[in-house]
Amino acid sequence: MSEFPDLYAESKERKTAFEQASAVFESVGITYDDFIGYITECIRRFKPYVVVSHDLDGEYGHGTHVLCSAALTEAITCATDAECYPESANLYGTWEVQKTYLHLYGKNPIVMDFDVPLEHFEGKTAFEVSQEGFACHKSQHWTWFYKWMYGTEESPIKKASAIRKYSPCQYGLYDTKVGFDRIGGDFFENVKSYTQQERDAEREKEFVRDQVKLYFTMRRNYSDWKLILR
């Protein structure tokens, strides 16, 4: 968690939401550049393969969501450049995010299925776990978002796919270094797992070892032939 205060601004216009949120944070000494620097540091520190963030329009116009997504689009580039925010580069090195998804982004759309029971969650779905998590977010329970998440007693929401407005399942691939999605439904499509990377690294080591053996075998055989020819 960051130390940024939970401040609020809202507008249906992205530009206005951005300006209002920027002004609110600047009033407490926090600039847009601070947002970019913080996200850049997080990327370098945690080295994610995939990053997922807010809608560029802040979903319903939430100014801080707008600030966050805008800053991220700059941070994914900054994180690769050691001269950009050099202090965090010196601490953690640089890092290139392989894929960046934004909520409700219109290009390269992807629909996630968060209603599949997951073994790691003891058969619960990702959406059910998110509902349990939001139950602890007491400061937000008075907002319209509570109904968006849970529905009503007469019509409770049991699945993420049942939410149509600001669907939690719809994203778009904003940036990729590993190609575009072909299958869909998986943020990690085209991304090699840690296990696969370890296997590839081991194969590379074996290949190098084999080449070295072959080289010395050929040299030895060549020396033997020279002796015979003499």
What are these regions (language model features)?
Residues 78-230:
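The feature marks non-catalytic terminal segments
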